[in-house]
Amino acid sequence: MVRNKINNDDNLSIPRVLPSNIQAEQMLLGAIITNNALLSYVSEFLRNEHFFEPIHQKIYDAIEKIIEKGLIATPITLRSMLTQDALFKEIEGEGYLAKLITMSMMVINPIDYGKIIYDLAIKRNLINIGEEVVNNAYNSSLAVAAKEQIEYAEAKLYDLTKEGLNEKSFTKVGISISESLASINRAMKNNDHVIGISTGLLDLDNKLFGFHNSDLIILAGRPSMGKTAFAINLALNTCNNMRLKNIRDNQEIKSVGFFSLEMSSEQLTTRLLSLCAEIDSTALRTGMLSEDKYNRLRKEANTLSELQFFIDDTPALSISAIRTRARRMKRKHNLGILFIDYLQLIRGVSKSENRVNEISEITQGLKAIAKELNIPVIALSQLSRAVELREDKKPMLSDLRESGTIEQDADIVMFIYREEYYLTRKEPVAGDAKHAEWLDKLNKVYNIADIIIAKHRNGPVGNVSLYYDSQFSKFGNLEKRTFNSI
C-alpha cells in the first residue's frame, strides 16, 4: 500500500549526513602522536574502525602497531609505515601529520575525545542495523518468519550495547576478597552449607553445594536413562527453592527457564503433573482417572500454575536465538536458572560442516550466557553409542558426543546411569542357577539412579545414588526415600 505524500515543503526528504566529528578525531590522533602514553587510556574501547575518516583509521592502526612493537609513534615512524599507502600520498600525509600535532595543542582531556569518537561510531552502527532490518523486512521471502527477523534485530542491538565501553575491568583483590568473605558468611549461616541454588536432593547438594551462577552444567546419559525426567525434577526443585529463599530474603522472585527442543510444552507439563500428583502419565494421557486422582491433579495444577516456571518448546533454535530469548527473560522475569533439553538439537550460527566445530560454538555460547546473565545453565547432552558396546555401561567423559569441546567448556559434567535398566534386559531363564544371582543384583539396584559427577571444576567428583520412581519419573533422596516437596 502506497500512502499519499503530503505536499508540504517541511516534509520534503532532506539528505542526512552520518554522525561524525572529524575535529575530535584529528585532535585525539595528534595528542597520541605527541604523547604515546595516551593510547593506553583509549585503546581499551577505541578501535581503528570507530574513526569516520578512512585516513584516520589508517593512522590510528599504524600508531597501535608501532607502539606494539616497542617503538615510538612519531611523524617519522608513521611516515615510514604509511608511505606506500595511496590515501596517505593523496592527502600529502607528512604535512597532515604536522597539522594533527598542531591541533593537539588545544586538547585538554584526550579521553573525552575518544569517547566522543566511539559514541558517534556506535550511532553509525545503529543506523546501519536499522537500514539492514528495514531492507530485510522488505526483501525477505515467506520462508523467513517475522519472529526470526525480530530476534536477529534484537541480537544485533544487544551485541552493540556490549561492545567497546565496558565498565568491567580489573578488580582489586581486596574487593574480591570482601565478596568471597560475604559468600562464606552466607554459607556458614546456612545449616546445609549450600551456597548455590539447592537441587532439593541432599546428597547431590553435598557434592555440588548447589548450582552456582555463571556455571555451565552438562547432564548427559544414554536414551531411557531419565535425562529429561531428572532435568524436570531439578527445574521444579530449584524453582521452588529459589522462591522460598527470595521470599525469606524479601527479594524479587527468580524464575526458571526451560528450553524443550525435543518435547512439546504439553508433554513436558504432563510429566510435571504426573511427578507432582503422583499419577501415572499414561493415565493422564488417556484420561483414565478416578475422582480422587482428578481432584489431586487439579490441586497440584493450581500449585504449579503459581510457580515462576517458563517453557519454550520452539524446535531447532540457534544458539543466537537462545541467547536472545534468555536475555529477554532475564529482563522481564528475573531469570535465575536455565535448562536446555538438549544440546545436540541446538543449531550453530556459523553453519559449519564440521559438527565438532559447531558443538564448540554452541557450548562456548552456553557458557557465555551463564556468565553474562550470571545464572547456572544446565544443558542436557547425548552420549555416544560406544557405551552400549562395553560390558561396563557406566559412562565416562570420553563417551560425550563431540566430547573434547563439551568437557572443556563445562564447569560440571554429570552422567545419569541406571543399572536396573540394563539388568532387566539380561534376565536369565527362570529356574536357572544364574537367575537367583541376577535377582539379587536387581534387588540391590531397584529404583536407584546413579548421578556420576565426572568433572567438577570447583569441587569433588564422585557418585551420588538417588531414589528413582519410574512410574512417576520422580527422583528423591535415597536414604529415607524422601522427595523435595513443592
UniProtKB/Swiss-Prot annotation:
According to its UniProt entry, one GO biological process term is: DNA replication, synthesis of primer
Q: Please give the coiled-coil regions recorded for this protein.
A: none
Q: Which Pfam families match?
A: DnaB (PF00772), DnaB_C (PF03796)
Q: Name the top EC class.
A: isomerase
Q: Which Gene3D superfamilies match?
A: DNAb Helicase, Chain A, P-loop containing nucleotide triphosphate hydrolases
Question: For binding ATP, which residues are annotated in this chain's numbering?
Answer: 221-228
Q: Recorded E.C. number(s)?
A: 5.6.2.3
Family, as annotated:
Belongs to the helicase family. DnaB subfamily.
Assembly mode: Homohexamer.
Name of the protein described by the UniProt record: Replicative DNA helicase DnaB
Q: Which gene encodes it?
A: dnaB
